[in-house]
């Protein structure tokens, strides 16, 4: 089958693309699966792994010499297309996550399960996440936990993810998915009300059995077209192959709301996405709560506290007494600080439409555990939570820059923050390198609480990062810890040509799990559409 786009065409003037590895002979319908080009608001290319069939992938079969060669060729094919990330058309590709990330410098996130560490961090230890798979008779709870531990979760956290199979519904059993030998109309083509109701009934039964369920993770790549129905019916976030692919693309795409739009020919798809998302009314689209530290400053476009940084509504509440200095030190909360923080979180929870809570300072990672204990909503109060995604996406010897307002301030608690993000092994923590921006011309305004001249500061931020990347040739991505650094993300993406994650990519990612997908789905928030 090969890539759907010819290698002969230059990628210079094409929008960013996500590469998708396909099982050999897979013919599930595009409208139903992750491979559908209409499922995305960016370009996708596909490469078939010859000889590696669905049954092999599902079982996590050890690759033969020929299969390993075919996998390398497929990855090479996708890299030749200039893809910004590589994923798989089957959640069971997680078995080959380690192998593939050794084959490429492109971030490889082969399964929706790679979102699990972020989810585990967002919710309390007592809360659970339902994992929907095609068939739990051959991918059971033990297999799921084994994969999650291999990804990087502790056994305790892995047990919080509860498997639920759909093999009792026509079209989902492993044998039915694998049986594509004829041209008959496959059962999964059916998106009838009957099928939707069967899936929703299964979820409802799982919820009754697990009352602590707070989110749904779709391991199956055949299910994203039902995500909106799940969001509408269950009222909980639903993470799937599409939320993951969107997240990966955003890390390498110009931000249309405040970005540089440096090369319109390359980043035009970002503007197309902006136009689609701007059709959603902020009144009906879910909102995000922002927990603010006790620190006042004029935010620039792209800052977490700047309302225009989002296409949706945000609500802000200050934790009085929790100062910037206190957040930096990361000491245990005083009684007064704890009361103020909990009060702010309660007010955010009570605000209309709020579906999750973030923070306006990366150092709040020190209080992520406190925040999630105080709230029934998902809490993701620091960009540092994304570190595990980086560690898992690249080869074990590849490295990352973590840009911060002041390197000396971040260093003392850096290891603890990484551990909270499920980056626990010393060899993995050593892959993350702090890069302080305190000496960049004009950036001292951040420490002074003054307005930052973004145009003045940008060249210095870029020069700093380029010099650091030159010293460390194995750097493959950048994380912006500070919530005042996203205004420079696009300039860094353009200069370094590597993914840049920040507080905005994190917030957009979590928000997408509770929002109507404008590319497909049931449009359950249609009252929010603005027709022009």
From Swiss-Prot:
An example molecular function term from Gene Ontology annotations: racemase and epimerase activity, acting on amino acids and derivatives
Signal peptide from the UniProt entry: none
Keywords (A to Z) from UniProt: Lyase
Top-level enzyme category: lyase
EC number: 4.4.1.3
Coiled-coil stretches: none
Reactions listed under catalytic activity: S,S-dimethyl-beta-propiothetin = acrylate + dimethyl sulfide + H(+)
InterPro entries (UniProt xref): Asp/Glu_race
Family: Belongs to the aspartate/glutamate racemases family. ALMA1 subfamily.
Assembly with partners or alone: Homotetramer.
Purpose: Mediates cleavage of dimethylsulfoniopropionate (DMSP) into dimethyl sulfide (DMS) and acrylate. DMS is the principal form by which sulfur is transported from oceans to the atmosphere and is a key component of the ocean sulfur cycle.
Protein name as annotated: Dimethylsulfoniopropionate lyase 4
Source organism of this protein record: Emiliania huxleyi (strain CCMP1516)
